[in-house]
């Protein structure tokens, strides 16, 4: 095998305050480090959730990602949870809207989607 594991996933957000609040304060990611990159005029925030690292680049005025219709590239991030229903209730209590819960036709497991401040689809899956 060429690779041991995925080291990190990088996403781009457009609003520093909204993105950091969403991923850290609402979803519970831990900030590992945070840097302003003057040469690029953007921020890079390294986040951690369990064994997963997420690089959050904040690039003001970045073009919007096409979600509908879907474009090539990263489709979504998916988080494993013990209970989709309980997690949906918690997301709703935080003011985060979700799609209706459904059952994955191939795995038989419950799942649903919600969106980050820049409309990146995020999935929760049992």
Residue spans for each PLM region:
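A short, acidic/glycine-rich surface segment
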Residues: 32-34, 40-42, 56, 61-67, ...
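Core segments of cupin and vicinal oxygen chelate
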Residues: 11-53
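Mid-chain, well-packed structural core segment of small domains
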Residues: 70-85
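Vicinal oxygen chelate
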Residues: 1-2, 46-48, 88-126
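Short, charged/polar surface micro-motifs in flexible loops or helix N-caps
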Residues: 50-54, 61-63, 84
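N-terminal beta-strand motif that seeds the catalytic metal site of vicinal oxygen chelate
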Residues: 1-18, 74-77
């Amino acid at each position: 095998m060429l690779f041991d594991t995925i080291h990190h996933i990088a996403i781009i957000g457009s609003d520093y305050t909204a993105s950091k609040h969403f991923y850290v304060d609402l979803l519970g990611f831990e900030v590992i480090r945070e840097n302003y990159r003057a040469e690029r005029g953007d921020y890079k925030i390294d986040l951690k959730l369990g064994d997963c690292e997420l690089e959050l680049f904040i690039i003001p005025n970045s073009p919007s990602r096409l979600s509908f219709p879907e474009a090539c590239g990263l489709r979504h991030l998916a988080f494993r949870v013990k209970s989709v229903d309980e997690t949906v209730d918690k997301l709703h209590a935080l003011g985060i809207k979700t799609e209706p819960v459904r059952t994955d036709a191939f795995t038989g497991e419950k799942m649903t989607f919600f969106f980050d401040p820049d409309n990146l689809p995020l999935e929760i899956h049992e």
